[in-house]
Amino acid sequence: MATITAAMVKELREITGVGMMDCKQALTENNGDMQAAIDWLRKKGLSKAAKKAGRVAAEGLIGVVTSGNKGVVVEVNSETDFVARNEQFQGLVKMVAQVALSVGADVEVIKAAEVGNATVATTISDAIATIGENMTLRRANSLEVPKGIVAGYVHNAVIDGAGKLGVIVALESAGNADELAALGRQVAMHIASANPVAVDPSGVDPEVVKREKDVLADKFRQQGKPEAMIEKITESGLKTFFKEQTLLEQPFIFDDKRSVGQALKEAEGRVGAPVRIAGFVRYALGEGIEKAESDFAAEVAAAAGQG
């Protein structure tokens, strides 16, 4: 039986908004498994949290650069937020993003790329020696469309193009570039705020859909719904899930009476051509890192080849 700590209970409460005692029971019943505890609470009708909010144990910056029909987003980690506010580190992040725009989003290719008389990897190593703290290029992603634009947005940017959360979104269209750019920035801001998991329902991981269906069906059974009705009301529940979790079906943050898909359709008149969301990437600093903060320096050192 796993030990249930106060920190685990606190985290589950922050994710789900459920009371402490229910959170402790959920963790106990599920042997400390956070995702299973979330699903257990949802089946009891106590929580609406649809997915695990990963614990963030990283510092650093997200960098975003776009140019016409392509764009990149990168994450460069440091050990402390103090370094993330350092001008040299901020310049490093912007340089890495610019290189990624030229050579693509493969981390190893970016590290091997030359800037001036040194590779990106060497430049990072030199910054480590100068600043006195480990740092690493953790990940990168890119988007490109044959016709259209890639728009970017950084939430609460500390400098132009770098902050704790960054988004790029590709709008495929033969329409007016200026109108597309304005529309793309709004959609990127929406993605930063609403955190969709996919462009539309077809892009949602089938395993996620299956788990959602199982949670909904179990919840309705516990509510005493007739078995003959469960499949129908589960499908209705899935429609709500997709409306909350997929970009085109979410209420648009700039006009919540319309979905993002409806807003795009209406914008086609201004753009002068059909508009399609070809894809998006949303990076929040440190997401997916679930180590204790005290272990993060070791992870950065290992990634940087320091140990």
From Swiss-Prot:
Keywords: Cytoplasm, Elongation factor, Protein biosynthesis. Its main location: cytoplasm. The keyword Iron-sulfur does not apply. GO terms for molecular function: translation elongation factor activity. It comes from the Bacteria. InterPro entries: EF-Ts_dimer_sf, Transl_elong_EFTs/EF1B, Transl_elong_EFTs/EF1B_dimer, Transl_elong_Ts_CS, UBA-like_sf. GO terms for cellular component: cytoplasm. Associates with the EF-Tu.GDP complex and induces the exchange of GDP to GTP. It remains bound to the aminoacyl-tRNA.EF-Tu.GTP complex up to the GTP hydrolysis stage on the ribosome. This is Elongation factor Ts. The gene is tsf.
